[in-house]
Design a protein with these regions (language model features):
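Bacterial Sec-dependent signal peptides at the C-terminal "C-region" and cleavage site
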Residues: 21-32
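Beta-rich carbohydrate-recognition and catalytic domains
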Residues: 30-271, 276-321, 328-383, 405-462, ...
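Glycine-aromatic-enriched beta-strand/loop faces of beta-sandwich-type recognition domains
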Residues: 254-259, 503-542
Length: 549
């Protein structure tokens, strides 16, 4: 194989993570706690002069126990926590009320001989320094705990708010809260306290946020309204509202929640997306409803009326449509020719296994979405294996910025990390373009990504005969590179490159020109036995023969 490539490498920058709570933990000398064990079914923890936290030891393979802060109120909520039975994988902080003289925790379903009773600690702080060698360098991750879908993305007063599905009590799915991070440039994130906590209505599932500029809901002009799904066996999946008067730091739940229930009692009814429809001066909500999307409208942001549905029989029909979004964009930059893109996240059953993001292009008249394509046409927003739950920021003007979850439900709970699980893909700007008389949705990393570049190095052109070995480039690389390659195929049918280390681990990325495929083979990249699909990932390409030169 002979190729003539030109390579430019730009060193990535380590993101600065500002932590808004403690950095270390230590055993308190002022506070005490006692255990009142009532068999294996109930243990009551009595704490005198409580610290900020009680640190709970976690064993990921242990059964869940129910932990409740007992204040005597009807709103007291059980959290499902995998307390250590025979070993401690890590600790998580359980916040205790400020200024309380005594605190009571009720812990159910944990045997008296469990290791956790010996390992529980009281502390005023909690160590969030990174301990995981597999944490991404420049992607947003939670400081600790589990994260999946991005939620409530909204821009206000110079800040991008990234809320997300979050379990603060372990690095596996559960106890859904809305975690919260903010950024001024979409690259460097400040971690804040969780914004919306699980309550007696259920888990806080995915949703969206808007800025109520005109005080339509009555909570003050400029307040942030969050719409989310409360999910529980008792109440099913219902849509709820919370509002913030302090720039999204804290939220108050609407006293008349829920604002919307499924009229037909549908089990899978979640992930509300709310957006402004200017031609009729109204708000529109999309809710995923089994294998379709349902549309509603409102003029007061509290009472919602059914409009229509879309999706039955369209595109890939998996177990469930999830995390909808819909944006209007100019086609090929022409502001006089606009189309709507309906984003639908689907799981499982996707072309490349597990979960992914498809979309539909069409028209929306304020009541119905009409797709341009036939039902059997499927369009994927991204062909990567780790791309799901893509949703867009609101209140960004003409700019449409989306953030995906960088994982896959095939293996997300068992990736080889402990302190945290999951990351967000880079924010990307969306657009519409035409190809072969059809319209497609494009997604490119936001321009702010270039600000991560530091030192760069150009490699002079060279000819490859079978292979060409570059020993080392940018050795002080802080764990990340950007590679830009210009490859002339010549007579080669397969061309690409390998990234490898001295442990024998490698990733192969190459073009198979006869089959028109881009292949990423990460089956030898290190720990790979946790996934259900460890075969090379192949992407079918659309290009002419001239484009391959």
């Amino acid at each position: 194989m002979k190729t003539t490539p030109w390579i430019k490498l730009c060193k990535g920058a380590v993101l600065a993570l500002t932590v808004s709570f403690g950095l270390t933990y230590c055993q308190s000398t002022k506070s005490t706690f006692t255990l009142e064990q009532k068999g294996d079914s109930l243990t009551i923890v009595h704490i005198v002069h409580p610290t900020h936290y009680i640190l709970l030891p976690i064993e990921e393979e242990a059964d869940e126990s129910q932990v409740r802060l007992d204040t005597g109120n009807a709103t007291d909520t059980d959290m499902d926590i995998r307390l250590a039975q025979t070993k401690v994988d890590y600790f998580v902080p359980f916040a205790l009320p400020a200024d309380a003289k005594t605190v009571t925790l009720r812990i159910q379903k944990k045997p008296k001989d469990a290791l956790c009773w010996e390992e529980i600690k009281l502390s005023d702080t909690f160590d969030t320094a990174n301990t995981d060698k597999f944490r991404p360098v420049y992607h947003h991750t939670p400081l600790y705990g589990w994260m999946n879908d991005a939620n409530g993305l909204v821009y206000k007063d110079g800040e991008y708010h990234l809320y997300y599905q979050y379990n603060p009590y372990g690095s596996k799915w559960g106890n859904m809260h809305w975690g919260h991070s903010v950024s001024k440039d979409l690259m460097h994130w400040e971690h804040l306290a969780p914004a919306i906590a699980r309550d007696t209505l259920g888990h806080i599932f995915s949703g969206s946020s808007i800025v109520d500029q005109e005080n339509v809901a009555g909570y003050g002009a400029g307040s942030i309204l969050a719409y989310y799904t409360s999910a529980s066996d008792k109440n099913g999946q219902i849509q709820c509202l919370a509002y913030s008067k302090d720039n999204g730091r804290t939220f108050t739940k609407y006293e008349k929640n829920p604002v919307l229930r499924p009229s037909d009692g549908l089990k899978d009814f979640r992930d509300p997306k709310v957006f402004w429809y200017a031609p009729e001066s109204k708000w529109v909500m999309i809710v995923s409803a089994d294998k379709e999307m349902r549309f509603y409208d409102s003029h007061n942001l509290k009472d919602w009326n059914y409009l229509s549905s879309f999706g039955e029989g369209y595109g890939v029909q998996p177990c469930q449509f999830e995390c909808p979004d819909m944006v209007e964009l100019p086609v090929d930059g022409d502001i006089n020719h606009k189309k709507w893109a309906l984003i639908v996240n689907v799981n499982p059953g996707c072309y490349f296994g597990g979960s992914a993001t498809q979309y539909f292009i069409g028209d929306f008249d304020g009541t119905k979405f009409i797709c341009d394509n036939l039902p059997n046409v499927t369009k994927w927003l991204d062909w990567g294996k780790d791309h799901y739950a893509t949703v867009c920021f609101s209140n960004t003007g003409d700019r449409v910025v989306a953030v995906p979850w960088m994982s896959n439900w095939q293996y997300c709970n068992i990736v080889p990390t402990r302190q945290f699980r999951s990351a967000n893909a880079l924010p990307r700007e969306l657009g519409l373009y035409t190809q072969d008389n059809d319209i497609y949705l494009s997604a490119a990393p936001v321009a702010e990504t270039k600000n991560l570049r530091k030192e760069s190095k150009d490699v002079p052109s060279f000819t490859v005969d079978k292979d060409y070995h570059i020993e080392s480039l940018l050795t002080d690389n802080e764990g990340a590179y950007e590679l830009s390659l210009n490859i002339i195929a010549g007579k080669a049918e397969i061309m690409g490159f390998s990234l490898f280390n001295d442990k024998g681990e490698k990733v192969d990325i190459y073009l198979n020109l006869p089959e028109k495929k881009l292949v990423m083979d990460r089956t030898k990249s290190g720990i790979v036995d946790f996934g259900k699909n460890s075969s090379p990932h192949e992407i079918c390409l659309l290009y002419t023969s001239d484009a391959a030169d």
